[in-house]
Amino acid sequence: PKTKLYRIGPGSANRIQFRVLDSVNALRQAAGVSTLQMDAKLNAAAATHSRDMAVQNRPWHFGSDGSSPIDRVQRAGYSGRMVGETISETYETELQTLSAWMEEPSTRAVILDPTARDLGFSWHQESNGKIWWTMVLGSPDLAAIPGMAAAPLDSAVNAG
């Protein structure tokens, strides 16, 4: 039987982003770590990288301009610490992609990182149906919380 191509329709962004947030939070709760909240600036960083990976036609963590995940998060205006980034080039749905990430120890560690508090998730879909997914996790600036110290931005964990 012919498989149906997964197409993301216009106006689906919020539904997809919150479906992923709910799924990630269920996985995090099951692992005994705190839940995340959606962050618009991390969403913007993820969207920028998804489009850029499509232009480069390769799934990797560096932008065509040499930018790192940390650079993109800072450019998007996120003032916290970047915890990690997961990426994928696939024809699979967001939940199939999340499941695949959870099967890999390096990406699972990013998704379940206990220091993360914020989530950004976005994608770029090509006309042939290929989807470039990017998830970015961050932690707010802990220096603003009494009794907490901020971790340096360069301590990010990047996983593929």
Name each model-derived stretch.
Residues 28, 36, 74-76, 121, ...:
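Mature, folded catalytic cores of secreted/periplasmic enzymes
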Residues 43-93, 111:
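Short, surface-exposed glycine/acidic/tryptophan-bearing loops
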Residues 29-34, 78, 82-83, 116-119, ...:
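Loop/turn elements at helix/coil->beta-strand transitions in domains of secreted/extracellular proteins
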Residues 25, 70, 108:
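Short glycine-/small-residue-rich flexible loop motifs, especially phosphate/cofactor-binding loops
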Residues 1-56:
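A short alpha-helix/helix-coil micro-patch that ends at or immediately precedes a cysteine
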